[in-house]
């Protein structure tokens, strides 16, 4: 402490000016610095926010897959119903066609017997 006081006057002779120390970047970094309570709260809040965002993303992804599955099931059901409808329609049409042919044959047979 005594040595610091014995430096003497600055070269510029301006004693009211503060003496500046050289900038050393390494000296500014404090390793293993203990965080203040505010910094701890801030860090904890940030971690909680990131955790919630990840949870939300996972839930959204899960809901999206569920929605896609439901959509696929609906499409499958619609296709199945459409196919069944066409089969019923085809059977009905086939029966109508057979009936028409039978009537024609009866007509032809009746004409031949005359």
Curated annotation (Swiss-Prot):
Q: Name its cellular compartments.
A: Nucleus, Nucleolus
Query: Which domain of life does the UniProt lineage start with?
Result: Eukaryota
One Pfam family matching this protein: Cgr1
- Main localization, broad class: nucleus
Q: Does the keyword Nucleus apply?
A: yes
- Nucleus recorded as keyword: yes
Q: Listed GO cellular component terms?
A: nucleolus
A single GO BP annotation from the record?
rRNA processing
Give UniProt keywords alphabetically.
Coiled coil, Nucleus, Ribosome biogenesis, rRNA processing
Q: Which residues form a coiled coil?
A: 39-100
Summarizing the function annotation, the protein's role is:
Involved in nucleolar integrity and required for processing of the pre-rRNA for the 60S ribosome subunit.
Family, per entry: Belongs to the CGR1 family.
- Protein name per UniProt: rRNA-processing protein CGR1
Lineage from the top down? Answer: Eukaryota, Fungi, Dikarya, Ascomycota, Saccharomycotina
